[in-house]
Amino acid sequence: MKILTKFFLLLVVTTCSLHYYCQIGQCSTQLQRVCHYTTPSVWDELLVEKNEFYREQLNPKVKVLKSHISQINSHYQDKVLPKLVDLGNRFYFDIVSPRIDNVCEFWEEFELKPYRERSLNQIRKVRQRIWFYYSVYLKPNLTKLDNQYALSDKYGKVHNKIAPFVAEIAQNFQNVYHQAAAKVHPHWENLRRTVNAKWEPISSSLWQRCRTNEICFKTNAQLKNIWKNLKLGCDYLSIYVHDALSPYSDGLESNVRATKAKSKSKPRVNASASARGNARAGAKAGAKAGTSEISASATADPTTSASATVTAGFEDDYDDEEPLYTSTSTIMLTVTMSTDQNELSPSQNTANAELGISEQDAIKDEFEAWFKVVDQKSSGVVKTFNKEVNKYLHHRVQQLDSIFQNKTKTVSEVLQNRYKNLNRAIQDINCTCETDTGAGNQTCFDSTGTTQLSEYITRSKMRELFAEAHSTLDQSMLQLKQDLEPIAQEVESRVSLIREEMVEVYEEWGDAMVSEWSKRLAYIDVVAGHLDDNGASTDEESSENWRKFLNLKKQVIKARDELAEHPADLHEIKQFVKKVHYLIEVLAKEAGEYLYILRARANLAFQAREQESKQREDSPRMDRDSTQNVENSNTTTASAEKSGKKAKKVKRVAQNGTNSTEKFSAGPDSSSKEPSMETTVQNNVTLQI
């Protein structure tokens, strides 16, 4: 769905763009046909004419829709558009126009000169810095490489091989460019005329309004002046770049001319050579004569002469049909000799050819920059050493941290296994044992009675397990401490190696800088002796330069000695070793405390088992004692019962005697005598028992 939506939007945008292009420009017949058949009104007319269903069913609704759209458009034109125009005018005149006036006033009062001077000063400083680094670092190294590997000869050979192909490619590209320009030019002209036809009324009205406004007119004049200055600055910059690159571009042009000359006929080569000979002869003659040529060059415009030189050189490279060598040599003479007549002298020209423009200032800048570089390097070599050591220590501490984490993890796992064995043995203390009467073997089970134990846990066995755990703990802690011992020696050897490498590099750098600048100072003294007429000032400057050079040389040696004797900061590795020792102590302390707790638990378990076994041994004796006690209690109970019965009989006899006495006292009769006799008989019997 997203793809269809994007395709539909692309189709709508393309169609609207084609319609707009056909309205404002002269499009081709095919585009006009496309625009015609993509217009909705055309399709409406065709469908009304040829489709009955559309004509009878849909066309009335389309007409109603068109009427609504026209009404909405009329309402928009009558009510909305005037308000929008009024709002836009008020926005422009109340907000935009005052801001433009303020900006124009600010620009009119703006002083460009300080910023221009500052930018030029910055450009000069950048140029001097680039020249210094080129003369100090690049030029000596490039010269050494060129002398060692003969790079100039190799470059010349490669260039001679590649130059014909490059020239051919450039010619083909130029032909293609001209052909494309010839094809594009008519379309470009049509587009330009169309744009001018549309834009000219607007631009003319804007220009009329700008001319009536004083601030706008002054701003336009200021912008024209700025554009003129920028163009002039670009021209001077191109002249400066061309003069700076002339030693390299001349060699390149000569190689290209040589490759072109090989591919062309000999008369043209002879003509070119003769033209160059005439140019050189004219230059030498002009340099020796020095009156008419120098006066003519003094009145010439530098910008015009330089531009003519560049144009002539370009035409000499790419258009050999026109012999412009004589004019080229004359113009080159004009640019080279365009100096003041009163200041020309052979010695000054020779010195300027050797040192270039403002060489004395460049030499001073080189001295200052070189002194600054050496000072920074000498003062920062110890900081660099500390930085390298800290970098190595940080990397090594990270490695050792991961290593010792793995080792402590391994030690913890070993100790955990020992703890598990001890806990299992402590649980197996409370076991149940059975003895086989036939074989005499003893079989033990755990507290649940489901798992058979391999052996019976005794106090001696538990002591062996605790001794093994303590031995494992001591060996692990000792191994960790032994692993820490070689780290200090390793770090010290590595730091010593870093120190030796940095000292060696610094010595090489110092030797190179000192030797190069000693040669440079000697060369400057020789050149300054030819340039300055005042020998005293030259000697003073030379002595001052050599004094500064000697001080910096001593500073280099002192910095080398400080680097060799500076103690390394090993705080990070010391903190790591201290942390590992603390971790070992904590681990050993915790393991010892936990083993002490396990020993106490084992002791309690043994005490409980011993008490239980003692109770088990004492239970038969207690059963015998309880049986005897029961028998004794039964005997006592029987005797008590007998004595009770006797007491009851005695009581009954006494009671019977009382009754008989009462009866006897009441009076004798026949009936009462018989019971008394029976009672007497019974009493006699009782007494006899």
Curated annotation (Swiss-Prot):
Gene3D superfamilies: Apolipoprotein. It comes from the Eukaryota. GO terms for cellular component: mitochondrion; ribonucleoprotein complex. One of its GO terms (biological process) is sporulation resulting in formation of a cellular spore. Residues 259-308, 610-689 are annotated as: Disordered. It is found in: Mitochondrion. Residues 406-435 form a coiled coil. The keyword Transmembrane helix does not apply. Residues 1-18 form the signal peptide. Residues 610-626 have a biased composition (Basic and acidic residues). Its main location: mitochondrion. Residues 627-637, 655-670, 677-689 have a biased composition (Polar residues). Keywords: Coiled coil, Mitochondrion, Ribonucleoprotein, Signal, Sporulation. Residues 270-308 have a biased composition (Low complexity). Component of the mitochondria-localized RNase mitochondrial RNA-processing (RNase MRP) composed of one single RNA encoded by the NME1 gene and at least 31 proteins. Absent in the nucleus-localized RNase MRP (NuMRP). Belongs to the SHE10 family. Involved in spore wall assembly. May be a component of the mitochondrial RNase MRP (MtMRP), a ribonucleoprotein endoribonuclease involved in the cleaving RNA transcripts to generate primers for DNA replication in mitochondria. This is Outer spore wall assembly protein SHE10. It comes from Zygosaccharomyces rouxii (strain ATCC 2623 / CBS 732 / NBRC 1130 / NCYC 568 / NRRL Y-229).
